[in-house]
Structure formats: C-alpha cells, structure tokens
Regions:
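Sequence-level motif detector for i,i+2 pairs with an aromatic at +2
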Residues: 3, 23, 113-115, 253
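Short arginine-rich
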Residues: 84-87, 294
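Basic, low-complexity segments
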Residues: 1-45
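Basic, amphipathic alpha-helical segments enriched in Lys/Arg and hydrophobic/aromatic residues
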Residues: 2, 53-65, 243-307
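Helix-centered, glycine/charged polyanion-binding patches within enzymatic domains
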Residues: 2-7, 194-267, 275
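Polybasic low-complexity intrinsically disordered regions
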Residues: 41-57, 65-71, 75, 79, ...
Length: 307
C-alpha cells in the first residue's frame, strides 16, 4: 500500500509560529516582566520571597526550551535584561533550585468547553544513567533512574489538559485517577492503551461520566456490573478475534495523538530531567509541559490528504 501524502494548508502561519519559538520575547513576555518581583504581603513569619512564582516558572521554562543549566540560565536571562535595559535581575541559580521544590507551575491554557476526545499515555524521562550508545555497546549498568511523565491531551487542539510526574514504579493505571481529576471540563470520551484496562481506571471514568475507549487485553472476560463500554469491547473481540474492528468503529486510533505529544516532548526538550530533588523534578517537568502548550497555542500545522 502506498504511503499517504499530506499537504500543510496553513504553512505561512505555522512557519511564523516555528520562528517565534526561538524568540526570547516569546518566552520572557511583558506579563512575566511586570510580575517579576513578589508584591504580595507574606502570610507567615520569616524572610519574604523576593521573586514571584511566575519569575521562577519563567526561568524553569527558559532552562528547558534552550536546554541550559541553572547557572547558564541565570547568566542568559541577566544578559537579556541588560540588553533590554530593564532594571531586573534573574534569581540566583541556588534560589531557583530551592524554590523549584515548592513552586506551583501552571500549565493550563485558557481554553474552555467540552472535550470530545481525551487521549492518555506516559513516557519515561531519565534522571540518571548512561546514554543509549553506551548501553548498546557495553550494556547497561545497574543504576538507571527514570521518572514517568503522564499526559492527557485534547485530540482536537493538541493541548495538554492534565499532566503528572511519578516514580518509575508507579503503573499507568495507578496514576490515572489523579491525572484525570485535574480537569473539571466535560469530556465525552477518553482513549488509552491496554495498560489502563483495570477496574480502577474504568471506575474513575464512570464516576466522571466519560465513555471509556480502552482496548481489553487478549482473552479478557466480562466484568459484572456497570462496565458496558468495556463489555462491548470484549464482545467485539470475541466475535472478530481481535480489537481491530472495535478500534475502527470507536475512532480509538485518535489515541496516536498522545504518542505524538510524547514525541514532541522528547524532540523539543530532550528525554531527561536535570534537577536532583524529586519535587524540583516535578516543577521542571511541568515547566516543560507549560512550554509545549505555549508552542501549541502559537500555531500547529493543519494538513489535508492529497494522495
């Protein structure tokens, strides 16, 4: 079968969005500059914070986008302020490292309304370990540490609606309830792979009145109770011998957009985390998600099939 060909119909707009990704003013905007220093009165005793949460978030975002260390990010942002003749200073790298453990990095977009298809998947981000070339040539060492990034993506807009970072030993199904509870928007259907075919995931989707598009595992049995979505998928599997027809009739293949999101994460920001503390790694991962959503909002390709 010949490979399908597509043509981008909004190339001028998308091309400009790609160029803007390299603009420092795209990431260090007026909103961040105006709210750089903390203005709120502290609610507890102790030394007040000098820099706002938005300032710390902005530093973490720039660090991920341009793949800098914290020290390099400090020097980079200070030089930008100097060139712009703006009387601001970047937080010290040690301050950013400390504040990253407690900062709440907001990645949600102002988009509202119903979500037709929410697609869910996870990927690994390396914290410690050798590169793939060394593993291929000499084998892996015992100490390899990873974190799992869980994402829920709107298949129509490509925006990341929910995101979470967990330890490597947390399964996808265990992380699912906390992930899906991050949004209160109405969702028609949620699609995920067979790793989410557990009662825990189906119960959470039923509680939120979301149609479950999760393929049952091979040889799966019926579940008693109110699991109509899954039992229909099991019945289809038994009649046809596979999940292929069920996937086609339910539009399950839109779930590939979640894999596209994972690919964008790795290609744009790399596949590793650099902060040492786990809470800091959570902030670093959420800054990555915030940056990806900002890129998505700036412009995405719109394509039509031509062959």
């Amino acid at each position: 079968m010949a490979k399908q060909k597509f043509k981008i119909t909004n190339w001028p707009t998308y091309n400009k969005a790609l160029i803007n990704r390299g603009s420092i003013t795209f990431w260090l905007d007026d909103e961040a500059i105006q709210a750089w220093y903390e203005s709120a009165t502290p609610s507890s005793r102790g030394r007040p914070q000098r820099y706002s949460d938005l300032a710390i978030t902005t530093v973490l975002v720039i660090k991920r986008v341009f793949r800098l260390t914290l020290r390099a990010a400090q020097g980079f942002i200070d030089s930008i302020f100097s060139l712009m003749n703006v009387p601001l200073r970047c937080p010290d790298y040690s301050c950013v490292s400390r504040r990253a453990k407690s900062v709440n990095v907001s990645f949600k977009t102002p988009t509202r309304g119903e979500i037709a298809h929410l697609v869910i998947d996870s990927t690994g981000l390396k914290v410690f370990g050798e590169g793939e070339w060394k593993v291929k040539k000499h084998g892996q060492e015992r100490r390899r540490i990873w974190r799992k990034l869980h994402l829920a993506v709107d298949s129509n807009t490509h925006e990341i609606i929910c995101a979470d970072l967990s330890l490597n030993n947390v399964t996808d199904s265990e992380a699912f309830p906390g992930l899906i509870r991050q949004t209160h928007r109405k969702i028609r259907a949620a699609a995920a792979d067979g790793a989410y075919d557990t009662r825990l995931c189906h119960d959470e989707l039923r509680r939120k009145k979301i149609s479950a598009l999760i393929p049952p595992r091979k040889g799966a049995g019926y579940w008693p109770g109110e699991y109509a979505d899954r039992n229909r998928a099991v019945a289809n599997q038994r009649m046809t011998g596979s999940n292929a027809r069920w996937k086609w009739t339910t539009d399950y293949n839109r779930r590939s957009i979640a894999e596209t999101a994972m690919y964008r994460v790795k290609q744009l920001f790399g596949g590793s985390l650099t902060l040492r503390d786990y809470d800091g790694q959570v902030a670093e991962a959420m800054a990555l998600v915030r940056a990806l959503n900002k890129m998505t909002k700036a412009g995405m390709p719109e394509s039509v099939r031509i062959a």
